[in-house]
Design a protein with these regions (language model features):
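Hydrophobic, well-ordered secondary-structure elements that form the walls
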Residues: 260, 291, 314, 326, ...
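Short, structured coil segments at secondary-structure junctions
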Residues: 59, 295, 318-319, 454, ...
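Flavin-dependent oxidoreductase catalytic cores
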Residues: 1-395, 399, 403-415, 423, ...
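Feature captures the FAD/FMN-dependent oxidoreductase FAD-binding
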Residues: 445-486, 579-588
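Helix-enriched interaction subdomains in cytosolic or periplasmic regions
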Residues: 351-364, 469-491
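Rossmann-like dinucleotide-binding cores of NAD(P)H-dependent redox enzymes
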Residues: 417-453, 523-576, 635
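Short gly/ser/thr-rich secondary-structure transition/capping motifs
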Residues: 6-15, 45, 374-379, 457-463, ...
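Rossmann-like dinucleotide/flavin-binding elements
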Residues: 386-420, 459-470, 480-555, 592-604, ...
């Protein structure tokens, strides 16, 4: 197979790790659990296999997609684990592990790729090397493992690797990062043991080295063994990059490790290990480059490798031998073939919202991608081309309207899109005014190119009325008219210094130097507006009525936003509902006790209160047209992933 586009000669060159022959430099790192459960029902397993099948057909070289938890009961009969991974432990002991893992391996090999699995033992919840808490976001006091329990775990690692090998996979990766038990032993912040498994680096490494040795004794020399390692710990008392490199040297010296998978961040921090759009593309790749300079081991780097061009640059600069790309492959399962052909403008861009993960982890919903409604649903039949196309009018050029217009045109309908503003994107336009959200403009630009290529007629500055829609004589009308700003029933909300956050971000209203932000939206809007105000040098106080900040923003994103706001001196108040706004005074009331408090010393009040569905046209037209639909924020104000998925479901029906 040719090496591909001349701009990507390094990315599409072959490479060898251990006995694994790789046709390009792209690894798809572990994320299989979010796309389906290979060990669950047959339907769940098929979702998992269908997801990977598409990416394998596209040319993936290495799928590290089977991430499995060890049995975390750790010798204690009847013990009930707690915390992350508690309900999904012990995959390797399942009676059908070999059969399902074997199907995964066979699928990869059938398409010319290698297949590896990752062994996870989530630590600190409740198992830990010492009594120190694993992170600062909870107070779960862990059980301190004794030496018999450590040996039990080492044996479990060896057994699990043997099961992986017996299923036909090419290798195993140990998860020594992101608050895994192995990392907790490595870290001076969480390991203060005084026996042979603590103290200096030799002691802190002992558990990991003994696990590796046990795996090698079980699997032999030809089975690939890799270590996924935090390059440094960006929190108080953790190890720095110099010590991380020394850990790498000692792993290399064993002669039993085939590669090092270099990452940054933890489950809860700033950064998290799934870095949101607050961070630059490949932000810590240069740190991986330090490891590559110091070691002979092949280096894999994962961390916001958001495009093929970023991946190429990382390889070309010598920062890594391979790159891990997960969310970029969520956004476009055909990224590899499009990049190989130089069709860069046809690749759906990942915009780093992390809603793909938060949907599952915060709300218990199915996996979904903000920019690609097909991701996670590959097992469903694709859209069917229509034999006789209809004329469809789509009103509204936000995420829902853009996706609907494109999908219906791809099905064979004739489509016109009306947008009342002079630009497409809807509320994404306002959100993109914050520098960490600039990736939103990439998605808007992608959709514009897509519509133009498909031949969708786009009419900007075109307001829709009941009469103009009827006059268009469309067979089908789709109303994606978005949401209006919600103005809660707060006394004084009409005062001239009370501003709407969206209007402030668009520059239509100007906030004073001292701002009180009324936060009555549960996702990113208050944090985004606060970030915008901070960038303008404003002094900001945020008032939330909820017991927690941004309750629908999950652990992988909240840290980055709060780190920025905290560093800027933003004051956050929770459990306070704004009752009354006056000139020079705001009255709040505690949602539980009813205790009133006053806020003073402000120039402006800015509202971040979400939206109210703009459904007036739908209500007036639904009885006057043969087929009219409503979707996106016009139906219920929610996030991008809901809008694009609803667009896809609607497109199936028309």
């Amino acid at each position: 197979m040719p090496h591909g586009h001349p701009q990507l000669t390094n990315l599409f060159s072959p490479f060898t790790i251990g006995k694994m022959q790789l046709r390009n430099r792209i690894m798809l790192p572990p994320h299989g659990r979010v796309t389906g459960n290979p060990f669950g029902t047959e339907e769940e397993a098929e979702r998992f296999f269908a997801y990977w099948r598409l990416r394998l057909q596209d040319g993936a070289a290495w799928i590290d997609g089977l991430n499995c938890f060890l049995d975390n009961t750790v010798m204690i009969p009847g013990f009930e684990p707690q915390g992350l991974g508690a309900t999904i432990g012990g995959y390797f002991r399942l009676p059908h592990f070999r059969e399902r893992a074997g199907r995964y391996a066979a699928l990869c090999h059938e398409h010319g790729a290698v297949a590896t699995a990752q062994i996870i033992m989530q630590g600190g919840m409740p198992h830990s090397p010492s009594g120190r808490l694993a992170n600062y976001t909870n107070n779960l006091v862990p059980h301190i493992l004794n030496e018999d329990e450590i040996q039990w775990l080492i044996n479990e690692y060896a057994f699990s690797a043997g099961e992986i090998q017996a299923a036909g996979l090419d290798g195993v990766e140990l998860h020594a990062n992101h608050e895994d038990l192995l990392q907790l032993f490595l870290s001076p912040a969480t390991n203060d043991r005084t026996d042979g498994y603590g103290g200096d680096l030799d002691g802190r490494l002992r558990f990991l080295l003994e696990a590796i040795a046990a795996i090698r004794a079980k699997t032999g020399p030809d089975f690939c063994v890799g270590i996924r390692l935090n390059m440094e710990e960006l929190f108080a008392g953790g190890y720095d990059a110099d010590e991380g490199i020394e850990i790498g040297r000692r792993l290399e010296a064993t002669g039993q490790v085939d590669y090092l998978h270099c990452v940054m961040g933890d489950n809860w921090g700033a950064p998290s290990y799934v870095q949101p759009h607050n961070y630059g593309a490949g932000q810590w790749a240069a740190t991986a480059g330090r490891f590559k300079q110091a070691l002979r081991l092949p280096i894999v780097y994962t961390g916001r490798v958001s495009s093929a061009q970023v991946a190429e640059e990382i390889i070309a600069k010598g920062y890594a031998d391979m790159v891990g790309m997960a969310r970029a492959m969520f956004a476009d399962g055909n990224l590899i073939s499009k990049a190989r052909a130089g069709k860069f403008e046809e690749i759906r861009p990942c915009i780093g919202t992390n809603d793909c993960l938060h949907r599952i982890l915060v709300e218990g919903l199915k996996f979904g991608c903000s920019v690609n409604p097909r991701t996670g649903y590959e097992s469903e039949a694709p859209l069917i081309q229509v034999k006789a196309g209809k004329y469809v009018l789509v009103v509204g050029g936000g995420p829902a309207g853009l996706e609907t217009a494109a999908l219906l045109r791809e099905k064979g309908h004739r489509v016109t899109l009306w947008e009342r503003d002079g630009v497409l994107g809807g509320q994404m336009q306002a959100a993109s005014r914050v520098k960490e959200n600039r990736a939103y403009t990439d998605f808007i630009a992608f959709q514009q190119r897509r519509l133009e290529k498909l031949g969708v007629e786009v009419c900007l500055n075109r307001s829709a009325t009941e009469e103009s829609i009827l006059a268009a004589q469309a067979d089908v009308v789709v109303l994606a008219t978005g949401a209006q700003a919600r103005r809660p029933a707060i006394e004084g909300i009409a005062l001239p210094f009370v501003l709407e956050g969206r209007e402030v971000m668009l520059g239509k209203q100007i906030a004073g130097e001292r701002v009180v932000l009324v936060a009555m939206e549960d996702h990113m809007q208050p944090l985004t507006i606060a970030s915008f105000l901070v960038d303008q040098g404003k002094r900001v106080r945020i008032v939330y009525p909820t017991p927690a900040i941004a309750p629908l923003v999950g652990k992988y994103s909240i840290g980055a936003s709060m780190a920025k706001l905290s560093s800027a001196g933003v004051e956050v108040r929770v459990m306070e509902r704004v009752e009354r706004i006056e000139s020079g005074r705001i009255l709040t009331r505690n949602i539980y006790s009813g205790v009133e408090q006053e806020l003073r010393d402000f120039d402006s009040v800015v509202l971040a209160c979400g939206g109210v569905a703009d459904d007036a046209l739908y209500r007036s037209l639904k009885s006057r047209l043969p087929e009219v639909h409503i979707l996106g924020d016009a139906y219920a104000p929610r996030r991008i992933s809901f809008a694009t998925r609803q667009a896809y479901n609607l497109a199936k029906l028309i």
